[in-house]
Amino acid sequence: MAVPWLVLLLALPIFFLGVFVWAVFEHFLTTDIPATLQHPAKLRFLHCIFLYLVTLGNIFEKLGICSMPKFIRFLHDSVRIKKDPELVVTDLRFGTIPVRLFQPKAASSRPRRGIIFYHGGATVFGSLDCYHGLCNYLARETESVLLMIGYRKLPDHHSPALFQDCMNASIHFLKALETYGVDPSRVVVCGESVGGAAVAAITQALVGRSDLPRIRAQVLIYPVVQAFCLQLPSFQQNQNVPLLSRKFMVTSLCNYLAIDLSWRDAILNGTCVPPDVWRKYEKWLSPDNIPKKFKNRGYQPWSPGPFNEAAYLEAKHMLDVENSPLIADDEVIAQLPEAFLVSCENDILRDDSLLYKKRLEDQGVRVTWYHLYDGFHGSIIFFDKKALSFPCSLKIVNAVVSYIKGI
């Protein structure tokens, strides 16, 4: 009986080492590290760890042990959360939706500014615990009441779970601002990555809601604002740049929208979108809307392949405004609150920010744009990770803080 256990104990280290070696090889064979990125060795290390954990998660999923998303979330939620003596942090539930409330302890002579925060993570990663440090910092430095919303994620929940949970929790909070000591004229909606998509979609959905306080401003940190044009210059230039490759994004997009992975190539090639739809939205999606300086490297003009009706029937909900808020009607865009947009040069989603910026400005919406030439997708989450932090991480956080304090 002891022999099988001994063999297993000897085999496990070899297995884990083998997976790590494979992850390192995959990184160096498939990953691009642009020259503008600072601390490239640090980013390489983080990406190798990321690939290692995702690969382990996928193996565990195939063995029926645990799904990859749940495995990763278990790991990042195991990090100890530090208490801040300046804040009261309370975990609540708005119906079935978990939320975390950050409130300054210091007395205030007037109602405070409110922030509603939607975290990122491609609907795969991210949680209240994972983004605790960032939200804690934002609440403390801006002296605001901050509500972070924990929405349902993969693999158990698909579209429109994120939108529904963030929308319902936001409405609940907006109806109870007085309870939390929040000034209804100073509510900011903030989100990162797919959380930025939620910001865009929810601020649009709240347009015309006379029964709720009007959102004062929206903060979108490298958001994804459209789900069907994946050949923009930044998608081509940064398709293999960590921490969000085009391949991983398309896979996550298909999983969240419940699209069979066999249609990934059709989505990449644009064959799942009818020609008349391309013509309708070309004015908003055209690379001509992107400044020339962003198209100087690694971009080849592109046009969609022949229309595939079967792919369209499978993936047509990509065109819903909840999933692609960039294509909302002008009448809706014109009524949106002012925006603070963060984009990173080394990010496949850079051009989403640039295109949404133009859409807002064309409709008279005030936009403050903050672009980081040394930035990459997901960098903000490392701002408080000390040795694993990057200069761009703190730059983004401080820029967001400075903007919100001006509200």
From Swiss-Prot:
Alphabetized UniProt keyword annotations: Glycoprotein, Hydrolase, Membrane, Signal-anchor, Transmembrane, Transmembrane helix
Pfam families in alphabetical order: Abhydrolase_3 (PF07859)
Enzyme class (EC, first level): hydrolase
Cytoplasmic side, ranges: 1-4
UniProt membrane topology term: Single-pass type II membrane protein
Sequence ranges on the Lumenal membrane side: 26-407
GO cellular component: membrane
InterPro entries reported in the protein's UniProt record: AB_hydrolase_3, AB_hydrolase_fold, Arylacetamide_deacetylase, GDXG_lipolytic_enzyme
Origin superkingdom: Eukaryota
Ranges annotated as spanning the membrane: 5-25
Example GO molecular function: carboxylic ester hydrolase activity
Motif Involved in the stabilization of the negatively charged intermediate by the formation of the oxyanion hole boundaries: 119-121
EC number, as in UniProt: 3.1.1.-
Compartment(s) of residence: Membrane
Glycan-bearing residues: N168, N269
Active site: S193, D347, H377
Family assignment from sequence similarity: Belongs to the 'GDXG' lipolytic enzyme family.
Protein name: Arylacetamide deacetylase-like 4
Organism ancestry: Eukaryota, Metazoa, Chordata, Craniata, Vertebrata
Gene for this chain: AADACL4
